[in-house]
From Swiss-Prot:
Subcellular localization, as worded in the UniProt entry: Cytoplasm
InterPro entries: Thymidate_synth/dCMP_Mease, Thymidate_synth/dCMP_Mease_dom, Thymidate_synth/dCMP_Mease_sf, Thymidylate_synthase, Thymidylate_synthase_AS
Protein name: Thymidylate synthase
Record organism: Bacillus velezensis (strain DSM 23117 / BGSC 10A6 / LMG 26770 / FZB42)
GO cellular component: cytosol
Gene name of this polypeptide: thyA
Length: 264
């Protein structure tokens, strides 16, 4: 995707070398935005092969409100293992905040259900927002949310989504995040009777780890190939009824996978 290669170049050319929590070191910039028209294909990176199974199962895991890695491990997904405790628990991370936000009066708020209800009943609302950044619970999370807030927008029968990501690992994380939120937008559009519009990806601290520079430069030498298509295998009425088997990726022809170490 041209948008992704442009981001890589921007960080390499304009970034500052900074230390970071993990001790790895980064090349970092602050503030950047990419836009993807979901009518033009499913934005899954082609300059390296992505593991769609991990992307899809992680999203389904979020939507279940689950915060234990057991479901992920049972489905061959290991991306959260480094942060889990000995029982597989991560604390009140994404799934908990999306589905069981603890309100000021002790009530539990299902942000996803409320979001879908509001899209259906008040599509012009400017409050179609889900937040994972629960200040009162940050210290209890294994990893505070990197992709921390997203908003939906309905116009001309199309549903668009904008994500704010406070911290973005360009090589490992960002390709997953793009595909995950594009998939979420398409799923919500499906259950609300809308067409997918745009996915807008807005960053705070967007960085390339020092031990990923070689891999990023390799991707910049690779040509951008046509985007794949994503379709659903059946009609689904509820966002919570989707399964992995409902997602069909067609015409995905990426360059080979590139390995990179995770900074924990």
């Amino acid at each position: 995707m041209k948008q992704y290669k442009d981001l890589c170049r921007h960080v390499l050319e304009n970034g500052e070398k900074k230390g970071d929590r993990t001790g790895t070191g980064t090349i970092s910039t602050f503030g950047y935005q990419m836009r993807f028209n979901l009518q033009e294909g499913f934005p899954m990176l082609t300059t390296k092969k992505l593991h769609f199974k991990s992307i899809a199962h992680e999203l389904l895991w979020f939507l279940k409100g689950d915060t234990n890695v057991r479901y992920l491990q049972e489905n061959g997904v290991r991306i959260w293992n480094e942060w889990a405790d000995e029982n597989g628990e991560l604390g009140p991370v994404y799934g908990s905040q999306w589905r069981s936000w603890r309100g000021a009066d002790g009530e539990t708020i299902d942000q996803i259900s409320r979001l879908i209800h509001d899209i259906k009943t008040n599509p012009n609302s400017r409050r179609l927002i889900v937040s994972a950044w629960n200040v009162g619970e940050i210290d209890h999370m294994a990893l505070p949310p990197c992709h921390c807030l997203f908003q939906f927008y309905v116009a001309d029968g199309k549903l668009s989504c904008q994500l704010y990501q406070r911290s973005a690992d360009v090589f490992l994380g960002v390709p997953f995040n793009i595909a995950s939120y594009a998939l979420l937008t398409m799923m919500i559009a499906h259950v609300t009777g809308l067409e997918p519009g745009e996915f807008v990806h807005t960053f705070g601290d967007v960085h390339i780890y020092q031990n990923h520079v070689e891999q990023v430069n390799l991707q910049l030498t690779r040509d951008v190939r046509p985007l794949p298509k994503l379709r659903f295998a059946r009609n689904v009425d509820s966002i919570f009824d989707f399964t992995f088997e409902d997602f069909i990726i067609e015409d995905y022809d990426p360059h080979p996978h590139i390995k990179g170490a995770v900074s924990v």
